[in-house]
């Protein structure tokens, strides 16, 4: 199609907001890593304003507890931040090492009314099939909530990420509403195959559909072409747009432009950029 119609509105399902102390730690961690220089600010109001200027109607945002003892604090911060951002849709966080992990999850869903959770497996350093969080999956499923999970091995594999343990979770909870971040890179094909058996499994496009993404810097054998036009058409009802903003070292447009350049029917673009997320999240 090439370009969006005038006035087109987006839903971005993958953005990051953190308290200032956590942002500072994250940016320090990335400092000095070639290709991971971030030009964008991190203030929540600024992020919301920027996204609004890009035609973003609603955006999903989250933080993550990288160790025990942080999840309650972060969820309270996310809840308070969401009160100031009418377009924002917060997802909660948990950590399996918290002895009250189920209580934390229930508070996020029932007290704060979060739409679900974000798990970042290789940052939080737990396996997706960790027995301590199986009750959390049960709560997500029972409440019709959504899990956004970074479970692919991109950009830096470690012992916690990867496909097999996530596949095990989906065998246990095949009806779970789940969005796999970054098109499941570097295991995109395996995630696409798993979607055949999991009717509520989605993939988000964040950082995966542009050749400028640092995901591919050290992996020339992978790239946006891992997802074909045929894949986008076949799974047009279960792919959702995400950007990774403001953790994007390239212009925001580069997250959308390569998708618009795919020769897809306008209806497919509308589903990916807006309608699928609107339906899934009940917006």
Regions found by a protein language model. Give the residues of each.
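Active-site gating/metal-coordination segments in enzymes
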Residues: 57-58, 66-161, 199, 209-210
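Conserved, mostly hydrophobic/aromatic
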Residues: 14, 51, 78, 108, ...
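A generic "structured core" feature
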Residues: 9-18, 169-172, 178-179, 269
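Short active-site segment of divalent metal-dependent hydrolases/proteases
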Residues: 17-18, 153, 185, 247
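Hydrophobic faces of well-ordered beta-strands that scaffold small-molecule active sites
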Residues: 11-15, 59-61, 89-92, 115-119, ...
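H/E-rich (His + Asp/Glu) clusters that bind or coordinate divalent metals
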Residues: 177, 186-283
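Alpha-helical scaffolding within the catalytic cores
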Residues: 42-48, 73-77, 101-104, 163-166, ...
């Amino acid at each position: 199609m090439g370009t969006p119609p005038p006035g087109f509105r987006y839903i971005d399902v993958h953005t990051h907001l953190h308290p200032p102390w956590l942002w500072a730690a994250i940016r320090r961690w990335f400092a000095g890593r070639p290709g991971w220089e971030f030009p964008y600010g991190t203030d929540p109001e600024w992020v919301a304003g920027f996204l609004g200027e890009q035609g973003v109607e609603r955006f999903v945002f989250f933080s993550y507890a990288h160790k025990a003892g942080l999840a309650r604090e972060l969820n309270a911060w996310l809840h308070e931040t969401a009160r100031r951002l009418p377009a924002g849709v917060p997802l909660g966080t948990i950590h399996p090492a918290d002895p009250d992990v189920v209580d934390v999850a229930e508070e996020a869903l029932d007290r704060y009314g979060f739409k679900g959770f974000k798990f970042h497996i290789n940052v939080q350093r737990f396996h997706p099939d960790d027995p301590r969080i199986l009750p959390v999956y049960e709560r997500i499923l029972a409440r019709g909530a959504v899990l956004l999970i970074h479970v692919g091995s991109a950009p830096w594999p470690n012992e916690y990420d990867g496909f097999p343990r996530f596949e095990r979770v989906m065998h246990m909870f095949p009806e779970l509403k789940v969005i796999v971040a970054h098109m499941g890179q570097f295991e995109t094909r395996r995630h696409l195959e798993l979607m055949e058996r999991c009717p509520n499994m989605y993939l988000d496009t964040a950082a995966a559909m542009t050749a400028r993404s640092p995901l591919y810097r050290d992996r020339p054998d992978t790239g946006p072409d891992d997802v074909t036009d045929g894949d986008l058409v076949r799974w047009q009802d279960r792919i959702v747009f995400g950007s990774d903003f403001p953790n994007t070292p390239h212009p925001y447009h580069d997250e959308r432009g390569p998708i618009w350049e795919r020769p897809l029917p306008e209806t497919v673009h509308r589903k990916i950029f807006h309608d699928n997320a609107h339906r899934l999240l009940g917006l």
